[in-house]
Amino acid sequence: RITEIAYFESDGNYCNVVTANKLRSPIGMNLTNLEHALDKQLGNEATTFIRIGKRFIVNKRYICKVNIPKQRLVITDYDRFTFQLPISRDALKQLKALITLSTEKK
């Protein structure tokens, strides 16, 4: 299920999926190809995921905190997992601007 996926992380020509149960499984494609596959397979539900920088695709439902000075993105479900992902400062600034923009539209 989509809700079980916390994030995808690039690992060279492959990537890993990390689940809410903290299980890490390899996927035989790079992050860009995975991003296209998610769009194709999930349709409207693909918006559940957001590409952040070069290394991550994150489940937006679990974004908790954007820490630009420490270059960390905290994602959590407040129960089973909390991950602190190292993200570039520029990617975090773009994410924060996107979150602010979508919050203002509501």
Q: What are these model-derived regions, one by one?
A:
Residues 1-106:
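Basic, polyanion-interacting recognition surfaces, primarily
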